[in-house]
Amino acid sequence: LKKSILTLCGMVENAVADAVDAVMTSDRKKAEAVIDNDIEIDHFELDVEEECLKILALHQPVAGDLRYVIACLKMNNDLERIGDLAVNIAKRALSFYSIPTAEMPVNLRPLCECTKNALGKSLDALIRLDADLAAAGLAYDDVIDEMNRENHAKLLGLMHQHPENVERYLNLLNVSRHLE
């Protein structure tokens, strides 16, 4: 079960990183790959859920083991949802295909890195059953929220200054929100 959750996490982390990279570089192929690969994440999520349900049905875990399997079920669902958010980001990237990267008004890479770090620490906490690691993952939340607020404020200002680019700025706002 641990190996399956780690594999799914790796798939999702790659999808998020590739989706953000597609936005930042207007890389159409990378965006399309993220969208196409989502079916693999969806299938893997179903496999992990089935594995968890088999453990519950066949082994009837109790106490700590039961909590662990339930936590894996929840994490599995959350990872699939994050994969779907990566697809949403990739779809936004397709709208930037014709925009030169030098004109990107916000840098989403730091937000992406913080999000990946928070996700990684949270997963490590689950796998190792480590409350300190869980707290370290939560510590990123305020930083991520602040980065999203900064992007939001900057993009709203740009919308007022350049109303002809409102759709583009709204797409970037959504990307930032999805990362948050």
Which sequence ranges carry the predicted segments?
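Cytosolic, long alpha-helical scaffolding segments
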Residues: 1-180
